[in-house]
Amino acid sequence: MPRYTVHVRGEWLAVPCQDGKLTVGWLGREAVRRYMKNKPDNGGFTSVDEVQFLVHRCKGLGLLDNEDELEVALEDNEFVEVVIEGDVMSPDFIPSQPEGVFLYSKYREPEKYIALDGDSLSTEDLVNLGKGRYKIKLTSIAEKKVQQSREVIDSIIKERTVVYGITTGFGKFARTVIPANKLQELQVNLVRSHSSGVGKPLSPERCRMLLALRINVLAKGYSGISLETLKQVIEAFNASCLSYVPEKGTVGASGDLAPLSHLALGLIGEGKMWSPKSGWADAKYVLEAHGLKPIVLKPKEGLALINGTQMITSLGCEALERASAIARQADIVAALTLEVLKGTTKAFDTDIHAVRPHRGQIEVAFRFRSLLDSDHHPSEIAESHRFCDRVQDAYTLRCCPQVHGVVNDTIAFVKDIITTELNSATDNPMVFASRGETISGGNFHGEYPAKALDYLAIGVHELAAISERRIERLCNPSLSELPAFLVAEGGLNSGFMIAHCTAAALVSESKALCHPSSVDSLSTSAATEDHVSMGGWAARKALRVVEHVEQVLAIELLAACQGIEFLRPLKTTTPLEKVYDLVRSVVRPWIKDRFMAPDIEAAHRLLLDQKVWEVAAPYIEKYRMEHIPESRPLSPTAFSLESLRKNSATIPESDDL
């Protein structure tokens, strides 16, 4: 028998349907009837027939026709909203598409599994789990470690030993011993009281990352959760039942208590949850619709679910992976700009970078050579100015290896810290099964990821700062020798004038966001937790800075491609022509002014999906594998001893010299 979960004026009602031929209108009337039945005053109505209503699907808010048959219009166990005439949409009803969902592909239930052991999760793995590309299972070794850890907790309960967080209160209440008959209530109260975050909910993708990372940490076997409960958490993840987790409220020690409590709250059947099937709804109904039961917490399990740095680390993981992707592509975008501005490749000579051998600097210089080597990839644009009177380029072109290079090295440093944090036990107290005891410590403190993510924001921001200056050079006719703002009939058309302003605004905003949050601390929990990391804000603002970098480079990419239009029929190198073709597949050239924001977003999407890298990477790697000799073309302004000797041979001797 099909059944539907119907939301009417803040209440959720389970409505069974014996006949799929019944209509949407019948479902609405039956839901209203049940709603009236539960109200002492019949909800203010005298009869069901007088109530006028509309029926929406919760998923996507699609309006349903009252005459449609239920078996055609809805799926079994689907969630719907009945909006009564005169009412607005119920105030506690949350749209089923939170902000940020557009960043990733639509959810499709994955077929592949990733086995978590608590020791080997990578940043790329976690991002893919967030995107819904894998389900989760535990390794057999992880299952055994979890069971052994739980046996220690069971012994503590049996022997009535006083242990923090298991048989005592929390924080300032650490010395308050809890009676044995209230230990389960203690854990539920912990989750409820600590679910005190505010702000917008995490997107489903980010909530998946958060939940997956918490599962990985629990799989290490140092938290004392039971295998039964952990498997219930995994089942919720695999069904994509995701709790409402507000983005604000963590100070980053003792761990990310507020967001992780919201995560646990949904798992125990309270608060809101989201799934692709239901959209947002009460957690108990979302779980039930997927054949799952709310978790019944055992002693220590509430604490095991909420104590750790997983909010900081999961958001930081996304920031890190996106920073890595945009840093690679920034080299390609900058190389394209250098071609348009008729810059020289002399500054990327291997000897220059060999005497200052920072790894990132050397790699960036190599990428520029692989993309701009006109002898290997003939460039008509480069040949058009090979012999010119320009001695050297501006810093924004000449110093790309040094500026972009340190960003790459920063990302590598941060990745090492975040990868360690992904596979670290950050609970308190820690359960050591091999010793048969628990030990209180401070692994929950988020200083490591907080400091690393502050550093990431500072480092990656510089890609946008230097990109904005290159956009200025492209738009300024006195610097580019191109039409002002890269458009014909300037004055009638404004071209990239305000797109450049947008880039400047993003760079300026990021400067404020680069102020480290981890230099701040406030004492909390009655001075028990008297130093905190503020890592949650470090992670969130790192993500915002990375997004700004992507958007600024999207504008530069469009500007550089537009600049090429004014150099035609000359062509650039093969890999850069491929990048140009990629951009033109989604954004046409500007002949005159048009609505520009969608084009910026289209270019942003190319960078976000790493399409620019995918196009250029084969040429970069081929150049690397073939060990192509470096070409060093001479120009009248290039000084060398060899050229000096040649010139000396042509100077006639004179008695006066």
Curated annotation (Swiss-Prot):
Phosphothreonine carried by residues: 396, 637
Gene Ontology CC: cytoplasm
InterPro entries named in the record: Aromatic_Lyase, Fumarase/histidase_N, HutH, L-Aspartase-like, Par3/HAL_N, Phe/His_NH3-lyase_AS
Modified residues (Phosphoserine): 635, 648
Reaction equations catalysed: L-histidine = trans-urocanate + NH4(+)
Gene Ontology BP, a term: L-histidine catabolic process
GO molecular function: histidine ammonia-lyase activity
Enzyme class: lyase
Recorded superkingdom: Eukaryota
This enzyme's EC code(s): 4.3.1.3
Consequence of substituting residue 322 to Q: In His; reduced stability
Keyword terms, alphabetized: Disease variant, Histidine metabolism, Lyase, Phosphoprotein
Pathway noted in the entry: Amino-acid degradation; L-histidine degradation into L-glutamate; N-formimidoyl-L-glutamate from L-histidine: step 1/3
Cross-linked sites for 5-imidazolinone (Ala-Gly): 253-255
Residue numbers bearing the 2,3-didehydroalanine (Ser) modification: 254
Transmembrane segments: none
PTM field: Contains an active site 4-methylidene-imidazol-5-one (MIO), which is formed autocatalytically by cyclization and dehydration of residues Ala-Ser-Gly.
Disease: Defects in Hal are the cause of histidinemia (His).
PANTHER family tied to this protein: HISTIDINE AMMONIA-LYASE
Family, per entry: Belongs to the PAL/histidase family.
Name of the protein this chain belongs to: Histidine ammonia-lyase
Phylogenetic lineage: Eukaryota, Metazoa, Chordata, Craniata, Vertebrata
Record gene name: Hal
